[in-house]
């Protein structure tokens, strides 16, 4: 992505409406990519690990999938071309997940998807109205700034039954196909949607699989109560202190 933007600094096609990107624009775009891809992913993983610690049945089901795909003291899912972890003899037959494993980690993806429904890192976004619109009894004039909250929409019982429940199994293919457009949009949507969405899904699934195949999560209940702190991203107000138990 950065390479494409750097080439844009030297490319100009007046007839096609392509203008050169100056150094300031390139710097701003690079900063956007780094900032948008850092804190959002960190918060998504934080909330996911917390939810797993509070829902042991879900955690166990996901771990069963990880063992099936990545191996667990046996040959299941083992790929001899990929070196196994050597951190402990008890996990020697578990290999590190790769991009090729992502399509097989269906339940892990559901866990991440449900986590970002309950706690979307990008919890609200703004849009400028380009024309006058009437929405119900409300008139939105051109150039108005409209705030759209993923958090509010993702907790709407019209679209998600029992919306405050962490329930990854709700994300069946049929259920996803029946959801109205933009009822679930953790990465925004339309032409201004997050350009890094495909990478973020891949990264999130692989990170969760890598961590949870080795460790079991326990939330430190002696720490402060878990509260929301909605800033640019949705983060836990007092941080998230976890205890890690190595799996055997």
Language-model region placement:
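Central I-helix of cytochrome P450 enzymes
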Residues: 11-70, 115, 144-149, 185-186, ...
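Cytochrome P450 I-helix active-site segment
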Residues: 1-2, 50-122, 129, 136-147, ...
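A residue-level signal for conserved active-site and pocket-lining positions in enzyme catalytic cores
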Residues: 5, 115, 242
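Active-site proximal loops enriched in glycine and acidic residues that flank catalytic Cys/His/Asp
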Residues: 127, 149-151, 170, 188-189, ...
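Cytochrome P450 catalytic core segment centered on helix I
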Residues: 1-16, 88
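Cytochrome P450 heme-binding Cys-pocket and its upstream "meander" loop
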Residues: 14-28, 142, 153-202
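C-terminal helix/juxtamembrane-tail motif
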Residues: 216, 233-248
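Cytochrome P450 heme-iron axial ligand motif
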Residues: 31-42, 50, 138, 172, ...
């Amino acid at each position: 992505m950065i390479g494409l933007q750097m080439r844009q600094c030297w490319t100009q096609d007046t007839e096609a409406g392509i203008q050169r990107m100056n150094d300031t624009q390139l710097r701003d775009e690079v900063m956007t990519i780094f900032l948008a891809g850092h804190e959002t992913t960190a918060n998504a993983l934080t909330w996911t690990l917390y939810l797993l610690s509070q829902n042991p049945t879900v955690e166990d089901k996901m771990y069963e999938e990880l063992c099936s795909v990545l191996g667990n003291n046996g040959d299941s899912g083992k790929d001899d071309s990929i070196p196994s972890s050597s951190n402990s003899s008890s996990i020697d037959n578990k290999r590190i997940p790769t991009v090729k494993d992502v399509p097989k980690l269906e339940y892990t993806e559901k866990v991440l998807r449900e986590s970002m429904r309950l706690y979307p890192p990008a919890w609200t976004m703004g849009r400028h109205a380009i024309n006058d619109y009437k929405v119900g009894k409300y008139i939105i004039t051109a150039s108005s700034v409209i705030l759209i909250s993923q958090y509010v929409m993702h907790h709407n019982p019209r679209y998600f039954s029992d919306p405050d429940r962490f329930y990854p199994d709700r994300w069946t293919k049929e259920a996803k196909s029946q959801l109205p457009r933009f009822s679930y949009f953790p990465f925004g949507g339309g032409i201004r949607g997050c350009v890094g969405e495909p990478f973020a899904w891949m990264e999130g699934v692989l990170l969760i699989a890598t961590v949870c195949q080795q460790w079991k999560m326990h939330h430190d209940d002696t720490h402060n109560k878990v509260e929301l702190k909605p800033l640019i991203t949705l983060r836990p107000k007092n941080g998230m202190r976890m205890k890690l138990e190595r799996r055997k």
